[in-house]
């Protein structure tokens, strides 16, 4: 699993935020567009793209895009 691809998939969920402004260190909850609807979209994206379970608690316990990636990557590796 590649963090650059994860960041691109994450950035695609935002309509008005420039994808170039999103990096591994981005504190996603501070993005102007961040909302509960985007959080649900993240959960759906992870399920569709990576075929692993991802919950609201995972998002609540994360601060950066890299935190999200690490959770997803660990689950992908565990299921491999």
Model-assigned labels for residue ranges:
Residues 1-43, 48-80:
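Phosphopantetheine-dependent thiolation modules in NRPS/PKS and related acyl-activating systems
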């Amino acid at each position: 699993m590649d963090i650059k691809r994860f960041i691109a998939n994450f950035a695609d969920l935002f309509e008005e935020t420039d994808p170039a402004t999103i990096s591994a260190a981005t504190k996603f909850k501070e993005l102007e567009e961040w909302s509960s609807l985007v959080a649900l979209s993240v959960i759906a994206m992870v399920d569709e793209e990576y075929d692993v379970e991802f919950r609201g608690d995972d998002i609540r316990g994360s601060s950066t895009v890299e935190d999200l990636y690490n959770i997803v990557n660990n689950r992908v590796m565990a299921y491999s």
